[in-house]
Each structure stands twice: as C-alpha cells, then as structure tokens.
From Swiss-Prot:
It comes from Homo sapiens (Human). There is a cross-link at residue 1142 (Glycyl lysine isopeptide (Lys-Gly) (interchain with G-Cter in SUMO1)). GO terms for molecular function: carbohydrate binding; collagen binding; signaling receptor activity. Residues 244-360, 389-505, 528-644, 678-809, 832-951, 979-1107, 1132-1243, 1273-1393 form the C-type lectin domain. InterPro entries: C-type_lectin-like (IPR001304), C-type_lectin-like/link_sf (IPR016186), C-type_lectin/snaclec_domain (IPR050111), C-type_lectin_CS (IPR018378), CD209-like_CTLD (IPR033989), CTDL_fold (IPR016187), FN_type2_dom (IPR000562), FN_type2_sf (IPR036943). The chain crosses the membrane at residues 1415-1435. Its main location: membrane. It comes from the Eukaryota. Keywords: Calcium, Disulfide bond, Endocytosis, Glycoprotein, Isopeptide bond, Lectin, Membrane, Phosphoprotein, Receptor, Repeat, Signal, Transmembrane, Transmembrane helix, Ubl conjugation. This is C-type mannose receptor 2. CDD domains: beta-trefoil_Ricin_MRC2 (cd23408), CLECT (cd00037), CLECT_DC-SIGN_like (cd03590), FN2 (cd00062).
Amino acid sequence: MGPGRPAPAPWPRHLLRCVLLLGCLHLGRPGAPGDAALPEPNVFLIFSHGLQGCLEAQGGQVRVTPACNTSLPAQRWKWVSRNRLFNLGTMQCLGTGWPGTNTTASLGMYECDREALNLRWHCRTLGDQLSLLLGARTSNISKPGTLERGDQTRSGQWRIYGSEEDLCALPYHEVYTIQGNSHGKPCTIPFKYDNQWFHGCTSTGREDGHLWCATTQDYGKDERWGFCPIKSNDCETFWDKDQLTDSCYQFNFQSTLSWREAWASCEQQGADLLSITEIHEQTYINGLLTGYSSTLWIGLNDLDTSGGWQWSDNSPLKYLNWESDQPDNPSEENCGVIRTESSGGWQNRDCSIALPYVCKKKPNATAEPTPPDRWANVKVECEPSWQPFQGHCYRLQAEKRSWQESKKACLRGGGDLVSIHSMAELEFITKQIKQEVEELWIGLNDLKLQMNFEWSDGSLVSFTHWHPFEPNNFRDSLEDCVTIWGPEGRWNDSPCNQSLPSICKKAGQLSQGAAEEDHGCRKGWTWHSPSCYWLGEDQVTYSEARRLCTDHGSQLVTITNRFEQAFVSSLIYNWEGEYFWTALQDLNSTGSFFWLSGDEVMYTHWNRDQPGYSRGGCVALATGSAMGLWEVKNCTSFRARYICRQSLGTPVTPELPGPDPTPSLTGSCPQGWASDTKLRYCYKVFSSERLQDKKSWVQAQGACQELGAQLLSLASYEEEHFVANMLNKIFGESEPEIHEQHWFWIGLNRRDPRGGQSWRWSDGVGFSYHNFDRSRHDDDDIRGCAVLDLASLQWVAMQCDTQLDWICKIPRGTDVREPDDSPQGRREWLRFQEAEYKFFEHHSTWAQAQRICTWFQAELTSVHSQAELDFLSHNLQKFSRAQEQHWWIGLHTSESDGRFRWTDGSIINFISWAPGKPRPVGKDKKCVYMTASREDWGDQRCLTALPYICKRSNVTKETQPPDLPTTALGGCPSDWIQFLNKCFQVQGQEPQSRVKWSEAQFSCEQQEAQLVTITNPLEQAFITASLPNVTFDLWIGLHASQRDFQWVEQEPLMYANWAPGEPSGPSPAPSGNKPTSCAVVLHSPSAHFTGRWDDRSCTEETHGFICQKGTDPSLSPSPAALPPAPGTELSYLNGTFRLLQKPLRWHDALLLCESRNASLAYVPDPYTQAFLTQAARGLRTPLWIGLAGEEGSRRYSWVSEEPLNYVGWQDGEPQQPGGCTYVDVDGAWRTTSCDTKLQGAVCGVSSGPPPPRRISYHGSCPQGLADSAWIPFREHCYSFHMELLLGHKEARQRCQRAGGAVLSILDEMENVFVWEHLQSYEGQSRGAWLGMNFNPKGGTLVWQDNTAVNYSNWGPPGLGPSMLSHNSCYWIQSNSGLWRPGACTNITMGVVCKLPRAEQSSFSPSALPENPAALVVVLMAVLLLLALLTAALILYRRRQSIERGAFEGARYSRSSSSPTEATEKNILVSDMEMNEQQE
C-alpha cells in the first residue's frame, strides 16, 4: 500500500455500514418509481434516419440501437421542465460533460439537477447535437448570425419514431398547481419524493388519490407542493357550485400568477377564468367573496388588438360592473380584476402583475367545439325595401334620428331595432344592409338597468362584437345605446340622443315550399356569397386535391376574412378528427405562404405554434377542439379531405370594404425613417441604453400608433432582409455574441385568448411569412409576443411585459403624426440657460406626455433652481387658460420602491411643494404637476390628462461614480473610523447628546470637522454599512436655506439617496439664509428606508450626527479593506465572504464557490448590500451573486433557498427572463444572461455544514490525502499540496501513489478553478506542475494519459520551439493562472493531484472484522439498532395513518390568507385539518 492512501477502516465503521445497509433493505418498498404517476401522452421514441435506429439509455450511457421498442422504458423519452429531456428507463436526464472548449464532450445520463446548463436542450437543435455527439451523417450547418428562415438542417435526420414529426412536436407545458403551499407556481418535473423520481403528477403519499407535484426539485428538502389540475366532468373537488345556474367556481386566493398564467391554470382544469354575464351571477360571486380581502383576475380582457373588451370563455359581454373611473389607461392595462374592497367591482390592470384568480366551468361540459352559426338562408317573403335573411327581414332607415325615435320608426313598420345573434347575421348586415353608411343604431341598450345591456326586441344577448376599448363609458347615463360602425361591424356605446341612421328587423313570411336558396350552385354545393362550396370526402394528397377541384371547374378554397372563416368552419363541423386542404401553400419552401392564385394573404387563422419552424408545406383546416384552425402539413405524404370553391363571377351582395389602399412606391419617408425602392413602407428603430426608455409590447405598440405608425410587421423575406441591413448599419455587423440579448419588439403576438394561441400581426396583415429561431424552445403558455433578435436576425417568443427596444413601420407618403397641431403647440423651443423648453397645451396622461417628449429627444422637465422655476412660472402664465391649471413635470415616484425621480435621471436638489403636498407614500405611482399661477408643485394620479412641459439639454450627466483615491494619505485619530481619505465619527449614542442640526454642525466644527458630505454611492455604502448598531437617525451636512439643497461647504448636490416619498418637508421660504430643512440618514428597520435620506425641520428636531474630516498626514493609515487582496476572506456582521476575481459565467462562479464549501452570496438586508457595494466598487467590476431567475421567467430566487425579503434592483429590473443577477459598481442589482462572463463574483462562506450542492455529479472523492482534503470539481477530484516543493518526477510519483495523476487542465473553467485555489498558497509556492509531456512522434504536447492538449493558457511570450523537447516541463503560475515552460530538473514546484470521481463502494463481506468476538459484537449491535429502527418506523407509519385518516377526500378551501401568511402544509396533512387548526 503506497503512502498517503487511507488506512483500512476500523471495525466500528464496518458496523455502521452494516446497520445502514440492513436498515435500507428493511425500509425499502417494492414497486418501480413513479408507479402511481399519471399516465402521460407526451412520451416518445427518438428515431435517427441517418443511423436507422432509436436513442436508448443504458447504464448512464446513450447509444442508437436498430431495435426500436415502444414498450422499452430505456427508449422512452419526454420533455420536462427547464428544457430537459427525461428518460423513463434510467429516471435521469440527457446531458453532456461540463461545457468547455473540448468539443468531444461525452453524451450520457445525469441526475436531473435544476441548475446544470449541460442538461438543457432546445428541441430545434437537439438533432444537431445528437448528430455531432453520436456521429450521424450530417449536412452543412448554416453560419451563425446569418439570416435563416426556419430551415431544419441536421435536426431533420431526427424524428419522433413512427411519425414524420420533429422533436418539438410533443413539447412540455408548465403545469400550474392549485392550493398547496407554492402560491400556484408550476410543477418542477421531474421531482424527488421519498427517494423516488417522478416524471409527472402522482398520488403517492396520499390516501385520497388526489394528484400532486412538488414545485422544487426535492420535496423532502423543501416541502413545496400543490395539487395538479385535472379535467373532470364534475365539481366535487376544489369547486363551489351554484345550484341555480349549474356553474362551478374555484377561488385561488393564495396563488399569485399573471393573467395569462392564471388563464392557463384554469384551462388545464377544463375551465376558464371567471366570466360574469348576469346580475344574479355577480350577486352570487359577491356572496362567496364576503369576508375576504383580495383582488382577483377574471376573464375580462382587451387583448384582441382589433376588438374591444371580451370574456376569455367567449361569453357575450352584456353585463358590466366597472368601478367609478374604470376602465382607465386602456392602452396599457388590458386585463380585468374583481375586488372585494369595492363589493365585487371591476378594474382593469396590467396583465403582467401577479394576483390570485377565479376559475369557472360548467359540469359535464365536453371539449367539443362551439356549435357553428346557422348560415343556410331559408326563403322568406319580405315587403318591398326589406331584405330577407334566415327567416327575418331587414331594412336600412337612412333618416337620422335619436335611438328612441329610430326604435319608434321600426315599431311603426312592424319590427324593432335590429338584434344580432351570430357572425353570419353580422356579415349579412355589414355587407347587405349597412353598406357604405359609417355608423348606425342597433337595438342593444342598457336603458332599463345601468351596465346591463339587452336587445330592444327582448331577444337573448348571446353574441357581442365590441370595438377596441369599448364599451368604455357605460356608467355615463348619456351612453346607454349602441351603434355599429366600421368595416368589420364592431359596436360602440354612444349617447342615445345622437342622430344616426338605423337598421330595422322583423320576422319574415315563409315562402311556399321554403327551401334553401342555392343562387345557382350545383346540387351538393353550398352557397356563401359570392361563391359555391363543396366538401370532397376522399382523403388525398395536396396535388390530387388541386386536380379534383379543377375537374369540378373550381379551385381549392381561399379564406379572406373572419366571416368566410366562420362559414367554412360550419361546413366541416361534423367531421371531427379530419383535416381539409385549402389553397394556402409554400410549395417552393420559401418560408412565405401564398394562395394558389398568387394573391397575398390578408387574413390568417393559425393553430397554436403554427406555421411552425420548417419551410415549405401546405395548409389544412383542423376539426374537433381546434375547429377551423390552420395547420401546415406535408404536401406529398399527408392525406386529407378538401374543400372546393367556385366563384360565380359578379357578387350577388356587396363585398366588405377591402383593406387599406396599398401604399405607393413613389411616396416619400418622414425624416429619420428608412426604406428601399422596392418597399412600400418606411421603418424606424427606437433604441435606448436607458432602461426607463424601453417599453413593454403594449407600450411599444402605443408609441408607434401615436406616430400614426404600427409595430413592425414582416410579410416577406425581402422586407426582413432590408430591416436586417438597417439594423446592421446602426449597430454594426459584429459576431452574434456582441449582440446577445438585444431584442426589438415586432407586431407579432398571440395575446388574444380567444385566438387559439394563433400568432397574428398587430396591424392586421396576414401571418404568411415566418422566421422563428428554431433553436428556441418558447412554445409555452405565457410568451405571447415576438421580438426580432439582433444576434440571429430571427424571431423569438417573449413575455409581453419585458421592457425592450422596438421598430415601427409606416406607409410611404404618410406624415408622422405630431402631438399637437395647434398654433401654440407649434411654438419654437424656448431657451433658458443650457436647456430648451416646449409647452404642450393639449392634455395627455403623464406617461403619454413623457413618451411625446422623447420624440423630440427630450424629457418632461426637471427643475433645479429658483431661477429655472421662475422661468417656467412666467411662461406658464402666458400659456395657461386658467390660473389654477396644472402642468405635468418630470418628477414621479417609482413603482418598485416609492422613491421620487426625475425622468431625465438628474438629482433632486430643489423642491417647491404646495402646502399639504406630497401626499403620503402609497402603492400607486404618483406623478407631479406644477400650478400655473403659483410656483408650487403637487402630486396626483398619473392617468389624469394634463398639459405638459418638455425639456432637452446637451449637457452630459455623470453616470459613474468617480474613481477611488489611489492611496489614503495619512490616518485618523483613534476614536474615528477611516474610509479612503476621510475620517468619520458617529455621535449621539446617548439620548441627551442628540441635538438640532446647527448644534450638530457646531459640535463637528469644534473637532476641526464638519457634518458629513456624501458625494457618491461608495461613501453612501460605507455609511449604511456602519448603521446596524445605530438605533437613531443621524444629521448629515445637507440642508436647504432657499428651495435648493446644498452641503455645508456650499458644494452642489451631485449625488442623492432620498427615501421613498422624500424630500417632502415644508418648502423653505424664498428669502432668508438660515437652513429650515435639513437632511438625516435613516436607521429605519424597513429595508426601503435604511440608509436613505429624509428632510426634517432643522430647528424643531434633535438627532445624532456624523462628523467628517480629512485624514491626518502625520498619522499612519488604517489597513485598507478595499480593494481586497486575491483569495482573502471578508467578514461583515454574521457573514463571511470570499471575492472571486476571475472571468466567470454565473454557473462557473457557483461551481467555484461550491469547491470552497460555499455558495454564491445571499444578500439578506441593506447593510450587507452596502458592504458588497463597497467590494464591487473597490474591485471596479460587477460581481455575480446567488440570485437567479427560473427558466423563461422573471421569478428570481436565491440558490441558497433563503426567502427573497430584500432586493436592490435597479429601476426596470429584473429585465432578463431566466437570467442571473450581479451587483454593479454603483451597488444596483442588474440581470444579464447567465452565460455572460463577468470579472468577479461573491461567495458566501457558510459557518455551519457545507450548503447543499446545486449541481450534482456521479461518484465521490476520497476522504483525505495526508493533511490535504480532496476537493470535488465537476467530474474530478483535486488535492492541493503547495507546501511540498518537489521536482516534476517526484510530483508524478506522489500523485501515482494517491491513485491519481499530476494536474491536467482541459478547458478555461478548470484553469480558473485551479488558479483560484492556487492563490491561497501564493506565499508558499510560485506555481504547480502540469502533467504535460512532449510527444516527439507527433511533435505535439500530450497529457499524462496521452490525450492531446486542446486547451492552453500560455503566458507571454508564449511557447517557443526550443521548449518542445524531452527536457521541458510545464507549470501553472499561482498569481496569474498562466502556464510556463521550464526545465524538469533543478526546479521545484507545488503539487496538485487529480483523479476521476469514483462510484460509492458497495458493501462487501471482506469489509467485516476477522475477530470472532468483534463479529458477535457487531451482530448484536445490528440487531439492537434494527429493533430500534423497526419501532421508529411503526410509530412513523402510525402517525402517517392518523394524519391521513383524518381526511378522506381533499376538500376545497377558500382561504383569505395572503401568500406570505399562508400556512405551509405537508402533502400528508389535509386541508380540513389545517382549517380546523386555524379555527
């Protein structure tokens, strides 16, 4: 046995092994993991056309086997959460070795660790990776960064076995939990429970049989869970039932989801978000809400860009219960809530905020599609001037009358104002009756009961078709009657006394032998103006369908508007499970779809995730639950039925108005917009570095529309090619990595919940050209808007509330719409000092006003001096129409923290509040106005419409704090604290020593000091970090004798850190030199206030204070903690931190911290935040911390799984979905892609047991080597012996005796890991040997195992030819991580040994002691401990039985607890028990 190898374990260790093994055998339970799991349909086999076999997992390895077997678990795969691919045989996830520069990474099966990036795959590129790693025959790959068009390259060789579907055909969709203790968070699949892995919802652990899942990876560790949604035909579990209407309701008070997530959760239960269509239903809901305090999502939304408010379940919007002043801000708040505080009143809110929600369903409802409208036109007799349709007669009354007079006129003719009950009837009225008339009365009104619309003829309201933002003013008694207007026949509520034409309707007289009118169609064909339609019932290929229609003198069907779509859907209603060919195709595989006639596609009705990613294909209509939706199918192999359409020439009835006229090619573009001679539109990119200038999709759409433009739509490759070139001219043609995470909103979206998850362009252009990035796996339920990715020049699905840049598009020859056309609005900019100002008299909300200012490269005005205030006041008196008129200025509170900010980012150094203003800080954003006749300010709701003032300046503002002083000149007295080149002292520990501001300043002057001046975030961080033991507020040197704040030395205020709602003190008098408002630093226990500033009365309050003076050159400086030396640990409060100063990705930093028995840092409070700010500023580099976002989400959590009680986000953050967080040099938290390399990170060193590792690997490391432990890192173990200075040969021998080899380094991350650990030994050795040799046969360097050196990190001047010889050895420097060549003899270095992780040693009889007496003792101890284990198990199971026996079926519990107060329940404890405990 070589020296250094661990000695044989003594017999007590064998005893413990015996006990554990027998105990495990005793506790083990039969049955394969997941036996109780729900059978899942999304399991598939992966087939390779190139290798002619299926992917199989065996023993941790992956291979392709020619024997495909659908019943063999090792070949069964499924997509699971976080883009991982799960194998049902191994119960593991597909992955590779840790990614590095080595391209020969091994493919294998790994534990499904949540954080491991090497387990994540994109379904579109999985085939490429499998071909590369398994050696399948491949074709060329398109060059990164080029403009692709969704082509399948090597991925096309990999398909789902038994079909032609690609590997994205069975994607994973998030499953949102109900009840439990996870606030509605989605399941984490797979998850571990009771040492078993589950790849779906399970009933294991529950005797009631209800399915549940964990919402974190390991239930046993976190105990986070929820019930799984199930589709059932009853309302027994989790539902309240209204016996009168037979509707069922589910109140999810403890969940917090966005509107779209809540809608998906309801849909997963065969339900929808709550719709309220009757007063009785509102009353019933109010009764269920009694006693609760909550705001909950309902199905009301305004997400259809071409329509108005609607219910997500397609119920008619006929009853409304808006609160007063609602809906407001309709352009940005598109989803509805019901509020208990207003007795069930409704409000509109931003759809992205997280709230509880209510689901609704009808029991015994099926998944069958809604029955189609009746389109058959039965013959009826009508009087002259009346026109027949479906048994009724209709007439246009051209004379303009009020609604009541119009109704009387209809009654005199034997009818009533028209009622509309279907899309078919609406089409007839729009085409045949309305014709060219712009707006007419219809019979809908709410005259009898406010907010409850009904038809004047008494018929049931079963169909509504509102205009965008309508109905919006129903609460006004003057808007009780409804009109129909516009080319699509949408509806608007209007004042009843308005004079308009109208439409009458009455029952018709059935004709003798009344039969359907055929309008000349052949037998078996169906008429719909202006064509005849025929269903071909044979299943044929696309070319055969074309030929068959041609043989009948017709063509495959074209669909040009929503009316034709509704009619065609009615034709195929009874053909469930079938497909029908249409004339839409991409036969040439261009990526653009066209009708066979060559016409452009002006209307589309795609199914979810269609038209997909591949180019080419032909379009068929689906049936069943996807009735009438369009899907792309293979033109040659897929067989479907077909629909022929035969035009009868001249339309019998007028057609709908066509789309807007096609713009001219000769029209000019507005200034600043670009175009190409072949394009009919002009384009402009709106981009800014500032987060506050970026916009959500809805805001970007509004910004374009305010200019008279639309968000970019792309109808062809040529159009997108021009836009790509335009972007390259602006941002440069760099490598894709340079432009990573730079996205631009385009108009493509699937926000409308009634659109079947179909992508649509916001400007109404048909979605016929597609270029989605096939490497993205973004087909989940919540990414409803699309972006153009600058790096790949392709499209990516994104959450609509993400703040991004955008691109607008406007027709040639169109002028950009100015915000104000009045003479006053067109006044020139007025100049004052170094800025220009413009006064806009038209009224806008605060956000709209700010947006208009940005069009002129300006902002809403900021005010920084009395002179500037006087200038504004003087001009306001000229522009204002009333003395008390209010004008918006740029001051506003942030929604994230309630702090006041100027829109231009300038410092708040001047205030002019009116008496009683500003109002106390609340949860709603506040915006500030200036009064015309007085020089004072007030705050009010930002949605109020006011005139406003814009300001622009060419003066550049300092954005970064100044550099640190190079050295501290001198030191501080013993009772003072030194920070850089200043000394500080906190006074006021005793209550009697707390004084007024002037007395504090005098006390400091007596010590040759002054009250502290805080000039940058670094000094502020030092002050805040000094506050944990301070229990009182502290005066600082900031004060205001006039209206502007300044420091005691009359230094201008260049940095501020005001608390939420501050400065808010009384405005100082304009005259007088004595300070009346002075600032304190708050010690508040609230994280939002700690260390912030507040302005207080200088003469009426007493506080502690902080004195400051310069260092004394005669004194020695204190040891400087900043910047810290490499490898040093810093202690603060109860925490210890290690700073990593290396180029690291986030996951690399996490691994490196874990190799130090630490984790990435957790920031629990503003004190620790201030301490880390000093560290980041001292190193002059951003630092990773342990806060990361869930995949594709802006939900962020600590890797240490601590609660997220404190955050330090920069405004607008977290911006990056699924990103990682760093502390920037100014202390603010920002997010970026986890793959970004930053130059440092912060580890939080645990004082207790090592934290659980977030990334796991097979095997373990030996217990120890002499006096040095083995350190695990990825797949290997390392032992550092830098105290031993050995020659190269001796180092090799020592590592061989330990079972390993001298250090080899295979990629950059491994080099960083070694370098980080070597820095701890920098004083003992200048470096460590590398196990590298020169191979004279190949003339190359090889590692000790003869593998080639594919990665290197040579220091200057590099590796010369003279160093490539048998006599050369190589080493790594401790202080730099660089590699050096040198001689093999007469040089000694430290030793680092490396060996692969080993599997846990199995139990072996040879490990038992040989002494018979010892054996007897072992066996007796085993029996004794086994008896104890058995007793414990019986008690445990009895307790389980008691817990579960108290609950026979999960009962629905409507709890009013907030999420933070919600009781966290183990899955084995029933809801009933928890309710009883609370009572």
